[in-house]
């Protein structure tokens, strides 16, 4: 199914996903199209930040749904530090 990912600049990226795809996979598809590493991406759907381990179906994402992409700020004592 085709979904859209909207960036902060207003650009819309169209991505073909399966309902069983994890959010992590959606981020990989965004990286393929935009070159933004998954660890720097935060995907928002229905006002909630999406968990990498959940699937599109867990969030009830349907064809034509629009996700919002925001970039994670560096620093702040994240997991990798």
Swiss-Prot record:
Subcellular location per the Swiss-Prot or TrEMBL entry: Nucleus
InterPro entries in alphabetical order: Nedd8-like, Ubiquitin-like_dom, Ubiquitin-like_domsf, Ubiquitin_CS, Ubiquitin_dom, Ubiquitin_ubiquitin-like
Entry-linked Gene3D superfamilies: Phosphatidylinositol 3-kinase Catalytic Subunit, Chain A, domain 1
SUPFAM superfamilies attached to this UniProt entry: Ubiquitin-like (SSF54236)
GO biological process: cellular response to camptothecin; modification-dependent protein catabolic process; protein localization; protein neddylation; regulation of postsynapse assembly; regulation of proteolysis; regulation of transcription by RNA polymerase II
Site (Interaction with UBE1C): 8, 44
Function: Ubiquitin-like protein which plays an important role in cell cycle control and embryogenesis via its conjugation to a limited number of cellular proteins, such as cullins or p53/TP53. Attachment of NEDD8 to cullins is critical for the recruitment of E2 to the cullin-RING-based E3 ubiquitin-protein ligase complex, thus facilitating polyubiquitination and proteasomal degradation of cyclins and other regulatory proteins. Attachment of NEDD8 to p53/TP53 inhibits p53/TP53 transcriptional activity.
Record's protein name: Ubiquitin-like protein NEDD8
């Amino acid at each position: 199914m085709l979904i859209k990912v909207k960036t902060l600049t207003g650009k819309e990226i169209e991505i073909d996903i399966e309902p069983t795809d994890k959010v992590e996979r959606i981020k990989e598809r965004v990286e393929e199209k935009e070159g933004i590493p998954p660890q720097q991406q935060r995907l928002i759907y229905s006002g909630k930040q999406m968990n990498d381990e959940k699937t599109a179906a867990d969030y009830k994402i349907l064809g034509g749904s629009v996700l919002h992409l925001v970039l994670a700020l560096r620093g702040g004592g994240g997991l990798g530090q």
